[in-house]
Each structure stands twice: as C-alpha cells, then as structure tokens.
Regions:
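Residues that scaffold the ATP/ADP-binding catalytic core of kinase and kinase-like folds
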Residues: 23, 65, 192
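Active-site neighborhood of HAD-like aspartate-dependent phosphohydrolases
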Residues: 2-54
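Substrate-recognition element of Asp-dependent hydrolases with the DxDx(T/V) motif
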Residues: 39, 43-75, 88-103, 156
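Short beta-strands and strand-loop turn motifs
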Residues: 23-24, 55-60, 147
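Catalytic P-loop NTPase motifs of RecA-like helicase/translocase cores
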Residues: 20-22, 63, 152-153
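Short, small-residue-rich loop/turn micro-motifs
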Residues: 16-18, 97, 168
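Asp-based, Mg2+/Mn2+-dependent phosphohydrolase catalytic module
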Residues: 2-12, 70-73, 77-91, 100-101, ...
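Short glycine-enriched, charge-decorated loop/helix-capping segments at active-site entrances
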Residues: 26-34, 67-70, 114-118
Length: 210
C-alpha cells in the first residue's frame, strides 16, 4: 500500500441549492436562506463520524450580474450559523462564479466580462471537487457527491468519486446509472453512505445501496 494513500479519508461533497438549502432561483436575499429538513442532523452525523463535509456550488448569478460575489460569502456565513445552531458544521466551501461565454443573460444585465469565460470549476467540470478533495486530504474512491442535478453526478465521476447520490425532486423521473443512487433527500443519501462505510476508521471502499 502506498503510505500516503493510507492517510487519506472519505469526504462528503454536497451541492448547495436544492440539496442543503431551499432552492430559490438565483437566491439574492439572506432571509430566503433555509436549510432543508433533516440536513443539519445528517451533517451532524457526518461530523460525529469524522467525515469532512464540503459544499461545492455553481453561482453563475455573480457572472450574470444578479448579485455580488460578497453575497455568496454572506449566504455561506448564514448557512454556517443555521448549522451551528443545530450542532453541525461544514468544513469547507467552494463556489464557481463563472459563466460560459455566449450564455443567455437576463435583459438589462450585461454580466461581468471578466467572469464570462470557460473554466474548470463550473460543474459538471470537476475543479471544485478536486480542490476540496485535495484540501481535505480526501480519498476520491471513498468519497461521495450529493446533489440534485446530473451535472453534480458528472462532476463527481470526473473527480473520481466512488459514489454519487442524486436527489430527485417531486415528480421527477430519471434513470439510475452505475455508482449513482437515486434518493429523495440529503439525509437519505447520508444514511446510505454511512451504512456502506466500514466501521474501522471509515476505511472501506464506499457506500452500498446500488
């Protein structure tokens, strides 16, 4: 065994909107930030298990000119407050403010030219996930991505994550894929993920539930 690989650990990577908090299109008011049911409890379970949690989120509203980059950070601070009040925490936060050139913009909004560019961090590109795994000494094979969109699953696959949990919205129908489990909530994803990790130091090969 490679000695360096033995020091790596599983990491739970989570999308933000529609996964951890209520999905408000281009969220722009702090008062609209609300954790989804069961999220704080599920993150607290991960905390107790010693598994780092990182938020990885696309925030193209910055590039579109809908809200300033500072608001993304204010929103994260509010999420942290809500989690801490419930005895939970996230360990890291990563966001992509970019938007591909030529994308449709809201009428009257010219966007921010320096952010209208191709990048490696806008999901389904894996850049945010790779940064999180690197910063948190994550073992991709034992790590998981949880999100409510196919782009989250594709980013997880590209980053080498062993497991993906795709949250289905009410009435949504989609097909599962190898190593992708369809779930109804973040808390369900965490329950399956934790059940599949080996008990000794979370050193197994990933979560079951396929």
């Amino acid at each position: 065994m490679n000695p360096s690989s033995s020091k790596k650990r599983p990491v739970l990577l989570a999308d933000r909107d529609g996964t951890l908090i209520r999905d408000v299109p281009y969220l722009s008011r702090i008062e609209d930030v609300a954790l989804l049911p069961g999220v704080a409890e599920a993150i607290a379970r991960l905390n107790r298990a010693g598994i780092p949690v990182a938020i990885v989120t696309n925030q193209s509203g910055v590039a579109r000119g809908y809200f300033p980059e500072e608001f993304v950070l204010e929103t994260q601070a509010r999420i942290m407050e809500l989690l801490e009040a419930a005895g939970a925490r996230v360990d890291a936060f990563y966001y992509c403010p970019h938007l591909e050139p030529g994308a449709d913009l809201r009428e009257g909004s010219g966007g921010l030219p320096h952010l209208l560019r191709a990048c490696d961090c806008r999901k389904p590109a894996p850049g945010l996930l790779l940064r999180a795994l690197s910063d948190l000494s994550g073992d991709p094979v034992r790590s998981a991505i949880v999100g409510d969109a196919d782009r989250d699953m594709k980013a997880g696959e590209a980053a080498g994550c062993g497991w993906g949990y795709r949250i289905l919205q009410d009435g949504e129908r989609t097909e599962g894929r190898p190593r992708i489990t369809l779930v109804r909530s973040f808390s369900e994803a965490v329950e399956i993920y934790l059940a599949g990790l080996s008990p000794e130091g979370k050193s197994g090969n990933g979560a079951g539930g396929r």
